[in-house]
Amino acid sequence: MRNPIDTFERWLIQSDGLGYADVAMYREFYKGEHDIRLSKRQETRLGITSAQIRSLANICPLVVDTVAERLSVQSFAATSPATERALAMWWAARDLSTYQDDIHLSALRDGDSYVIVEWDDAAVMPEFHHEMSYDGSNGTGIIYSSERRVPLYGFKKWRLEEGDDRGRARLNLYFDNRIEKYITGRAGAWTEYHDGERWPIPWVDATGQPLGVPVVHFPTNPNGDDYGTSELEAIIPLQRVLTSLWVDLIAAADATGFQLVTLTGDVPSEEMVNAARAIWYSQNPAAAWGTIPPGDLSLLVEAVRHATMTIAQVSRVPLTMFQDSRAVAAADTIVASERGLIAKIADRAKTYGLSWRRVMRHAVRLHNTFGPRPALDEAGIVTNWDSFEELDYLTLEKSRAAVAASHLSNGLSMTAAYTLAGYSAAELAAIARTDTYGEEGLTQ
């Protein structure tokens, strides 16, 4: 039998240097915990904490969530109708329509996510466990063969936080034909973990053939590599710039954003507080009053806008999602602005679709080994996605009409109001031809 220490050392050597430490950074930036900190003097001077400034300037969730929200598996197709029905039943029974959101989001944020497929004897069906990517301390991963891109084994490592073994670490290694479980001893050495099952747990079918590694990998944009790339990989440097610009803008606004009153020839009293409607005076005939005009903040404001625009370009998320505007774009404009985003979502769906197919193939294999008859055919399983397009024309029209009505109530002409609301010249002409929406009716 394989020495557990040798097994773990092999895992440790092969998994070293795979960039797991970056996963923790991606999660911190997603939560707004950036590595830019205000000094105590800045916090006191600006009246704002490091946590508040990071929350104010945090764009990372939008970059991830915009893609994750549009990735939704609709159903699975298969060569066999019986297989299709089984997949649909498992999907509904295991609430995977909800759990898929967490799987996709963590894959986009961390670069990789995982699903472990096991068999549930009580429910007589497969069960699916979403596992987070390994961050150097806890999590799941896969080790691939250096010769061919095939999984050698998967792993899950975690720290126990309850029970008699609290403070000890657990490690499961998932091979294609067995599962090995380990736990650290009191001295920190790894030993076999026995929970009433055979050790190692056989992972083979009725004929003794391997069932395959039950850990399924969901990589994001692997670019031919074994592992994925976080959506935040290229955004974090820009996020640091944006956060720093916000600090500069707030500091500049506090120091030079308002007109200052000057006094020469006298000493100001404590009652001279720069407040609204305050009246200052001096009884000294030599006193002279003056003002220092507010500083020009437009360059810093433009720098913030440019950094935001660069993030939009790099992430291929439409700029309109980063900025608030009363003007509503026309439908054609929205479609054009989302082409890059839709292309990225479709690319991610291709990769995740293959992963979902592996999940369901493994589930069928477990059903055929441990479940009731008849056996299911795993051939031809295909992942079907909901539409990636999010354009709701009825909602768009309601929004545009509301914006137009707001402009009209402020006294704008019909042409100006509807142009600002995103209506094209052809749409304006059609509106003007109707009795209900004529110029007179709209401005009454």
Each language-model region and where it sits:
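Long, highly charged low-complexity segments enriched in Glu/Asp and Lys/Arg with interspersed Ser/Thr
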Residues: A421-Q444
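Periodic self-assembly scaffolds
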Residues: F388-T419
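Extended, helix-rich architectural segments
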Residues: M1-H129, Q444
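Long, contiguous amphipathic alpha-helices that act as assembly "spine/axial" helices in icosahedral shell
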Residues: I48-L62, V67, A86-W119, P222-L263, ...
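Extended, regular secondary-structure scaffolds
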Residues: L108, Y114-N223
